[in-house]
Amino acid sequence: MEIKYVKGDATSPIIVEGKKSVIVHCVNTLGAWGKGFVVPLGQKYPQSRKIYNHFIQLHKKGYYTSLLGLICIAPNVSKDIDVVNLFGQERIYPIMKDGEIIIPLDYIALRKGFETIVDSYASEYSYKPVPITVHMPRIGCGLAGGDWNKVEKEKTYYTDERF
């Protein structure tokens, strides 16, 4: 899979004829949707927030022991555009513990989420290359304080192998 880095608005993916655009972003498990990339995303595609809230409610009712690493897809939020909410962090901001900064981003959860995204779309299409384009901000590297080099490594491992 060829990776192109484009500066711009990740809520407005570049549409490629014959391919579905998939916007992937990282969400927390708290039910807090109100800072960072989710603000413009939720304004443009309210279905993405609605399905996120649905998963939060299911978690609170005990349907999931943990949301970390899970994804929830808001399909067809616009013509040929899906939004994938990837549960990759438990908190919103880094904290200080015993003199060490602990970030809320969980790289293992990201890895699991990327793998699930790849499996979901690869199984939807029985041929390769899978006709999707993936669009995402530097997930987990804003408020959550993650390291883009580590996130990129996880993302590339799964996408390069499958698409």
Residue ranges of predicted features:
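Macrodomain-like recognition of ADP-ribose-binding/processing modules
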Residues: M1-F163
